[in-house]
UniProtKB/Swiss-Prot annotation:
Major localisation: mitochondrion
Organism of provenance: Kobus ellipsiprymnus (Waterbuck)
Lineage: Eukaryota, Metazoa, Chordata, Craniata, Vertebrata
Function statement: Component of the ubiquinol-cytochrome c reductase complex (complex III or cytochrome b-c1 complex) that is part of the mitochondrial respiratory chain. The b-c1 complex mediates electron transfer from ubiquinol to cytochrome c. Contributes to the generation of a proton gradient across the mitochondrial membrane that is then used for ATP synthesis.
Bilayer topology: Multi-pass membrane protein
Record family assignment: Belongs to the cytochrome b family.
Co-factor binding details: Binds 2 heme b groups non-covalently.
Keyword Repeat found: no
Name of the featured protein: Cytochrome b
Name of the gene this protein is made from: MT-CYB
InterPro entries xrefs: Cyt_b/b6_C, Cyt_b/b6_C_sf, Cyt_b/b6_N, Cytb/b6-like_sf, Cytochrome_b, Cytochrome_b_C_euk/bac, Cytochrome_b_N_euk/bac, Di-haem_cyt_TM
Amino acid sequence: MTNVQKTHPLMKIVNNAFIDLPAPSNISSWWNFGSLLGICLVLQILTGLFLAMHYTSDTTTAFSSVTHICRDVNYGWIIRYMHANGASMFFICLFMHVGRGLYYGSYIFLETWNIGVVLLFTTMATAFMGYVLPWGQMSFWGATVITNLLSAIPYIGTNLVEWIWGGFSVDKATLTRFFAFHFILPFIIAAITMVHLLFLHETGSNNPTGISSDMDKIPFHPYYTIKDILGALLLILVLMLLVLFAPDLLGDPDNYAPANPLNTPLTIKPEWYFLFAYAILRSIPNKLGGVLALVLSILILVLMPLLHTSKQRSMMFRPISQCLFWILVADLLTLTWIGGQPVEHPYIIIGQLASIMYFLLILVLMPTASTIGNNLLEW
């Protein structure tokens, strides 16, 4: 009798990717975040689909349609808050996933890493457009401020912004197109994720030691399927704690006021997961300079393979690099805090120092520490 699992064209793909996949025997819980991101994506697509059934992308009715979802639709409130807080969980998993890649040298897999950076940018674009849809005060002003940054591009900037707006300000046309893009992008993300996995399965997973694990592989199922299920349960636990006990903890109170172009909020800020980049943007007094720093703060990830000077792949046995890595994490937390503060003393100078530190750590200090580590081991 033939094994359908190994002969059927579709089942064969599933089998080779999730069942009989040879995986390193020593990958830790830091390797759980890939599957958690997949779960987050599916959850966001499903909750988003049900929200889209009741949402209207018109400036006059968008805000009230979200209110209608929360008040009148059966379990609409839980779908709405699962979607909003699901985005936060998505980004927590994303940051952990990228951090794991940086710490253990996963960026040596060039194709997988670069596709991952593309995924990060796409997810950030999707989340930004999603934040505009409820058409609250922070939605409107966030959209105005962030899209306006494109006007810093020489020659074509102003035309580009008006083209994206579909007029001379953020208005009905902007909201409609943002809804269209916000709906389609998660499916594009899912497609790019398939390519991400395709490239990963060409090389196999990295592991904490950073050395080849070809001589010590175990099947993905049941060992890592059960481990991923545990991770998924913990993710859903944290998400439901947020949704049911503190649904507005990570949101902005200003977004409960309908968008008003005549009234500017005291501090305009994006969602918490963009605050680190927003702080870097604000720390530079020049508009174009700020925009470049903002883009580079994420795009710098592409340079990681070039900045890898160590003879070892992972940071597991590199204490100096480890210290700098955790300083970088602390620096990003500082930037996140600063991004949510008003532009005044002492926040301005703290933000500027943290921004300088961010680029200094990645571009100078960490490669230098790796070289020192090589010399200490007389390599």
